[in-house]
Amino acid sequence: MTEPQGPLDTIPKVNYPPILTIANYFSTKQMIDQVISEDQDYVTWKLQNLRTGGTSINNQLNKYPKYKYQKTRINQQDPDSINKVPENLIFPQDILQQQTQNSNYEDTNTNEDENEKLAQDEQFKLLVTNLDKDQTNRFEVFHRTSLNKTQVKKLASTVANQTISENIRVFLQAVGKIYAGEIIELAMIVKNKWLTSQMCIEFDKRTKIGYKLKKYLKKLTFSIIENQQYKQDYQSDSVPEDEPDFYFDDEEVDKRETTLGNSLLQSKSLQQSDHNSQDLKLQLIEQYNKLVLQFNKLDVSIEKYNNSPLLPEHIREAWRLYRLQSDTLPNAYWRTQGEGQGSMFR
């Protein structure tokens, strides 16, 4: 099995001291920060598109003016301010006059609109000519698609327990197509939300693994350096290599790997040059290589799932959202299977 290609390279277990240098540590640290920063920009852009439709969040907020209150005490109030009429004061007579003017203006515009009203065919042509390529393709597919006439008529006759006419069948066929389209659109939105949440989970994993990689590499690098003065000059950065990592008790694999990594990070024998210290360094290199493979394997991009099929969970969640949004859909009592009214067994 080929190893996943990525921005980071593994450390060989043989002849590794020449690789573990200060320059390698800072270049790898910079690479990890750069990858996480690019992923952060991508995640922020995706979340912004999901929440605001691509517009800036600041444009959706109402900017309230900031008032500066004077804390000086007023000893005497100005007499003119008591009898002063407030600005922009509107009296009932002004409101009635404004409503009368608006009514006359609307009547005039209504007469003009009736003369300039386009025919239905002209409106349809105007709509089609102003669609882009993607919208035109979707419109043509939706316009040509129709539900099966026989199945619609059979289903309606079964529910109504009578033969339905042809015009009712055409009406139910059109309404059913619109209803199915709304459910599918909601299912696509649900799928996009699920993919976005998975993207956030992958980003959190990559951030956590990147933080561990910097600690492991720093611990390995400074365990090789013997010059104490040189070590003190570069060791005081933002990466606490002796800080243990947290884990969850219900995740056995993560608990085992994190416990082993914490014991290696907090070990004082790495600074020595005996056989035990070499074994600890090899174990730390092995842990580092595992994290490198995981870091390279993670991908926060969700564009590769754009053409993925809809799942039953998406349709089920879309149906639930549709019922909440419409708030007028009656309960399907005929589907009840004994838990509620038991109408299916009557």
Swiss-Prot record:
Question: So which domain of life are we looking at?
Answer: Eukaryota
Keyword annotations for this protein, in alphabetical order, are:
Nucleus, Phosphoprotein, Transcription, Transcription regulation
Carrying Phosphoserine, the residues are: S236, S238
**GO CC annotations?**
nucleus; transcription factor TFIID complex
Q: SUPFAM superfamilies from the entry?
A: Histone-fold
Q: Which compartments does it reside in?
A: Nucleus
Main location, first listed in the record: nucleus
InterPro entries in UniProt:
Histone-fold, TAF11-like, TAFII28_dom
Query: Would the keyword Transcription regulation turn up in this protein's UniProt record?
Result: yes
A GO BP term, please? RNA polymerase II preinitiation complex assembly
Q: What CDD domains does the record tag this protein with? A: HFD_TAF11
Gene3D superfamilies attached here? Histone, subunit A
The set of disulfide-linked cysteines is none
Give the molecular function GO annotations: chromatin binding; protein heterodimerization activity
Q: Does the keyword Nucleus apply?
A: yes
Every Histone-fold domain range: 131-329
Family annotation (PANTHER family): TRANSCRIPTION INITIATION FACTOR TFIID SUBUNIT 11 (PTHR13218:SF8), TRANSCRIPTION INITIATION FACTOR TFIID SUBUNIT 11-RELATED (PTHR13218)
The family classification in the record reads: Belongs to the TAF11 family.
What does the record note on quaternary structure? Answer: TAF11 heterodimerizes with TAF13, but they do not seem to form a heterotetramer like TAF6/TAF9. The 1.2 MDa TFIID complex is composed of TATA binding protein (TBP) and the 14 TBP-associated factors (one copy of each TAF1, TAF2, TAF3, TAF7, TAF8, TAF11, TAF13, two copies of each TAF4, TAF5, TAF6, TAF9, TAF10, TAF12, and three copies of TAF14), ranging in size from 17 to 150 kDa.
What's its job?
Functions as a component of the DNA-binding general transcription factor complex TFIID. Binding of TFIID to a promoter (with or without TATA element) is the initial step in pre-initiation complex (PIC) formation. TFIID plays a key role in the regulation of gene expression by RNA polymerase II through different activities such as transcription activator interaction, core promoter recognition and selectivity, TFIIA and TFIIB interaction, chromatin modification (histone acetylation by TAF1), facilitation of DNA opening and initiation of transcription.
Protein name, please?
A: Transcription initiation factor TFIID subunit 11
| Source organism per UniProt | Saccharomyces cerevisiae (strain ATCC 204508 / S288c) (Baker's yeast)
